[in-house]
Amino acid sequence: SGSKTAEIDDGCFGLPLDPIGSTSGMGCRSVPKPIPGGS
């Protein structure tokens, strides 16, 4: 989330209100993988 790679199509919430999701990957609903470039 917030990152370029963090998008709804990627299984993550591409919303700026979820900055933690882009760094820890907790923004992903099915695949909790770390999103590069999130920090």
From Swiss-Prot:
Compartment annotation: Secreted
Origin species: Pseudechis australis (Mulga snake)
GO molecular function annotation: hormone activity; toxin activity
Keyword check for Mitochondrion: no
Disulfide bonds: C12-C28
Family: Belongs to the natriuretic peptide family.
Protein name from the UniProt record: Natriuretic peptide PaNP-d
Tissue/organ expression: Expressed by the venom gland.
InterPro entries recorded: Natr_peptide
Record's keyword terms, sorted: Disulfide bond, Hypotensive agent, Secreted, Toxin, Vasoactive, Vasodilator
Alphabetical GO biological process terms: regulation of blood pressure; vasodilation
Superkingdom in the source lineage: Eukaryota
The keyword Magnesium appears for this protein: no
